[in-house]
């Protein structure tokens, strides 16, 4: 059983062990879908739902599943929650579901979800397990949204375009255009732009971590001197 506190679980999911920036998992949907903010939010919310549900379920049955069928059982649980997320999107956000296409069912193959189920949920009680799933999901969603906003803004010159696909007619006029006349940059909308954007985000996180580490080192007090001195003795004693 893990001895992590709630604050450690939160920090790991959001920053220190972020599934996208540190573990670098789930790259296929992350790079393919994040051309706009609304696509990123749709996939991120579906992944968050699956992470929380699968972590909770795995934690509840952790004492009843033998080692030999552990992984197949986890995959079946994850697939069940992915099916639930897929049906919900078909019912309430069908147009967005059509845009995301195969990447919703492919959540089953996201190594981050199976990894959390095996490494954490199967060894911890339900409350820490669902908290871990929530924080990992929110951390993944935050990276998706940031990358989607970067690619949409640089690639198309807009933000929050097509939000009505997720939130209905009330969000139809939420689109932001910082520049009226903006030459579209197709490179950022295509997969190579996603690689560049993700690389910049990872570099930014590593730079922040290094800066904080240097600040902590500078703030540490210098070791206190004992006041004793060593005397070097040469020659022989007769």
From Swiss-Prot:
Residue ranges of the region described as Disordered: 215-238
Topological category with respect to the lipid bilayer: Multi-pass membrane protein
Keywords from the UniProt entry: Cell inner membrane, Cell membrane, Electron transport, Membrane, Translocase, Transmembrane, Transmembrane helix, Transport
Enzyme superclass (EC): translocase
Assigned EC number: 7.-.-.-
Family of this protein: Belongs to the NqrDE/RnfAE family.
Quaternary structure and interacting proteins, as annotated: The complex is composed of six subunits: RnfA, RnfB, RnfC, RnfD, RnfE and RnfG.
Name of the protein in its database record: Ion-translocating oxidoreductase complex subunit E
Gene (name only): rnfE
């Amino acid at each position: 059983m893990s001895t992590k506190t709630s604050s450690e679980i939160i920090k790991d999911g959001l920053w220190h062990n972020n599934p996208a920036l540190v573990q670098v998992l789930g790259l296929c949907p992350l790079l393919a879908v994040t051309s706009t903010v609304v696509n990123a939010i749709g996939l991120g919310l579906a992944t968050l739902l699956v992470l929380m549900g699968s972590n909770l379920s795995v934690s509840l049955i952790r004492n009843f599943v033998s080692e030999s069928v552990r992984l197949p059982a986890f995959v079946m649980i994850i697939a069940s929650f992915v099916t639930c997320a897929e049906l919900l999107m078909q019912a309430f956000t069908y147009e967005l579901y059509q845009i995301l296409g195969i990447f919703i069912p492919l959540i089953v193959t996201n190594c981050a979800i199976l990894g959390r189920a095996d490494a954490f949920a199967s060894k911890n009680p339900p409350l820490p397990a669902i908290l871990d799933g929530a924080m990992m999901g929110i951390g993944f969603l935050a990276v998706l949204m940031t990358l989607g906003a970067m690619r949409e803004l640089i690639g198309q010159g807009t933000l929050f375009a097509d939000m009505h696909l997720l939130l209905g007619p009330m969000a139809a006029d939420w689109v932001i255009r910082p520049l009226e006349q903006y030459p579209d940059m197709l490179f950022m909308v295509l997969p190579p732009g996603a690689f560049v954007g993700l690389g910049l985000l990872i570099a930014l996180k590593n730079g922040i971590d290094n800066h904080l580490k240097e600040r902590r080192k500078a703030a540490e007090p210098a070791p206190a001197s004992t006041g004793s001195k060593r005397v070097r003795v040469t020659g022989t004693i007769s």
